[in-house]
Amino acid sequence: MISLLMIADDFTGALDSGVQFAKAGLKVRVVTDLNYELENAGDDTQVLVFDTESRHMDAKEAYNRVYQIARKGAMYGVKYIFKKTDSGLRGNLGSELQAILDATEEAVMPFFPSFPKMKRITKEGIHYIDGIKVQDSVFGADPFEPVKLSYIPDIIGLQSKADVKTIKLSEKFTGDEKGIVVFDAMTDEDLSARASTLFKMGKLNIMSGCAGLASIIPDVISLKGKINDSFSIETDGMLVVCGSVNAVTKAQIKYAENNGFTKQGLTPREKTNRDFWSTEDGLKSYDKIEAAYRQNNLFIIDSNDPEDSSETKEYMKSERMNLSETEDTRITCGTYKKTLKDWRYQSSCCYRWRYSCWSPK
């Protein structure tokens, strides 16, 4: 039976917070089908996680997606609804928190933005990444959706009509607050203490935060599961498809290259022509990727241009494409299937100069 429903705005977030519950031994199911019916989760599912893929949508559409799922959860009688937010405050923060409030008709939405283990903390309502304000961090330098503010009520207020209150570590939560309440936290102990207080007051039926909150919530609300001490995964290799422009991710890819992985880039045509992968040239590209993978099954496909290169930009210019067109169409490579001897991939590749996903099937 579903005890907690989580709503994340992207697949990475769905996984990095869902796994916090799995670590506690809980049965977690992650779904990407927005029409998925909760009764189909089965009696053994304790935590159901929806990936709405709404981070890069306009605020209204993001609101609608989150509202529909939260409303479904409320009508189904799920005890706890958790809005998973980005630890760097990207995405449609205000509209999605507002959607949870409206769908559940709860009076207050507690928001815990901190992720202390990752050095992401909130102090006096201001969010910090590695000791600097979020607007001055890598999230503020995001080339697509930079976080331009650091005071969280200001960020929420861009998309929400709700009252927003901040509560410092030295201040008390009375239980009479309305709207969205942002809690300071600089350690996991801060998160646990505050969340425990709200739980005892019956004010934690809905909640919001990132993986930092997810990591402490099972203990706070006494969600129990059986931890499997003998879990292993056997694999003959690893295929990574990266489209992130985040500096940390780029460093991780470089580290992997230096430790045995082979990296292959994509041409501008492969990235921006949504019909490419169904063409003869596209099928040949598949074959080349397969052959390279067979040479080294620790393999990275990187959709970013080489450092200091503008080849994709120049290609788009020559083809009379512009960024607004890629925003409208999301330069989707479509959903394509190909059997590669004894292995198959179904890849849903969304090129927005930032994102692509390739998943084994």
Where are these regions (language model features)?
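Short, structured active-site "lid" loops
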Residues: T45-K60
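N-terminal basic/disordered segments at the start of proteins
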Residues: I2-D44, F112-K117
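Conserved, well-structured core segments that form the ligand-binding/active-site neighborhood
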Residues: I129-S285
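Short amphipathic alpha-helices and their capping/turn segments at secondary-structure boundaries
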Residues: E39, L101-T104, V108, G282-L298
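Short beta-strand segments
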Residues: I7, V49-D51, K83-K84, P110-F115, ...
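Hydrophobic alpha/beta core scaffold segments
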Residues: A14, V28, G77-K83, G202-N205, ...
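Short acidic, glycine/serine/threonine-rich loops at helix termini
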Residues: S17-V19, N92-E96, R120-H127, A193-T197, ...
